[in-house]
Amino acid sequence: MPHHTGFTKRSTRRSETPILVISLICAGIFLFSMPARGAPANTPPEFHQLAIPILGVTLNQQHHPVGIVTHVVINFEKRHDHDGLQLRFRVDPGRFSPYAQQAISTAIARACKAANLQNDSWTIYLTFPYHGVTMYGDSLSAMVGLSVVAMAKGEDIIFGRSLTGTITEDGHIGTVGGIPYKVQAAYAEHMNRILIPEERATADDEWQTPFMMQVSPVNTLDKAYYGLTGHRLE
């Protein structure tokens, strides 16, 4: 059974707290980088910021699933020391559930391993910029992991492209659900290509690719990374 990603919104009135269930994907974005290759030890650390559009599935007022777009912001810092990866999840404006945090942490580690990158000098901050909202699930994790790799390598994610899925232990894109709704949400936001797991979730209905949009099934991290950046993972 594939895992889903979602969020809930906190309220000061418990009886009025709405609950949204989301299956998130990530599509990429805006990448701002300031490389400092070969910088001496007294120079500032290398810093990048990436805002990732997130596609998901929520319930409308009639409790029917619909696609939705949110964002996650990644701040990446490459330090001069090698004291270990520091991964921090901000709690304001929104926050990440423990399960989402673990999924993201695992995906980053597996993406770095596949790319043969040492991450012991990195500090990464993740922000969910929606007041009072908590993100749940794991289907954003592959996009976050590969986005961090792209930031470390100084490679851009092509605007209008996105990925939904997890990263499995053997380095493949893991199955997630809600693909038909995610495709429609991506189309509504004028994304031109999304990458989905090659293995389909059994609960998903049949769907058709919208006009002028490309949906690409991928099964390996290298194929997913190439689809997002136009570069090889290693």
Region annotations inferred by a language model:
Residues 38-234:
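Peripheral, non-AAA+ core regions of ATP-driven protein-machinery
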